[in-house]
């Protein structure tokens, strides 16, 4: 691929820091002194590089009883009590009221999504957990953080109580060829990250072809 720049002046790319960068890569991957080293290949065989360690096994999703009508009504009412008073549509500072979704998480806890400031395909959102019984108080929620540089609390969310899978997506534009996507697996105690991919450039590629920055296999329910 040839990079073309405007104008007639030849482009200059400084590679002064490249050797140090490659040496750091070799150090992290433990390739120093081997024939596969990037900065300064040595005489040790490529087999001297330690193999990839298998990812830690995740606990299977234990399943959960669906929310009853009384639980759902109580949860929605408890969340709405925490929201500011709604504005009338003719008010100058009117914003659409948040959309609230509730899901069963464990026998004692529910998962709550609050969506606000929604555009065509992007919302701001908040994730929390509440007790499934009155007064439906907030409960601790353990969730593995996304890698550095990701965008939190913006985009869209989906949760599937049948499988314990939580997914988020942030599209850079409507056709969905750039942005971020992530998936978590609920193991009965915490949400463990199983997939995170990011495509900063809108290039016509579907999310299945985006660079994967994190991957872990979620076990199936027995």
Report the location of each language-model feature:
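Surface-exposed loop/turn elements that mediate protein-protein interactions on large endomembrane-trafficking
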Residues: 81-89, 127-145, 185-190
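Acidic/hydrophobic-patterned starts of short beta strands in beta-sheet-rich repeat architectures
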Residues: 104-116, 160-170
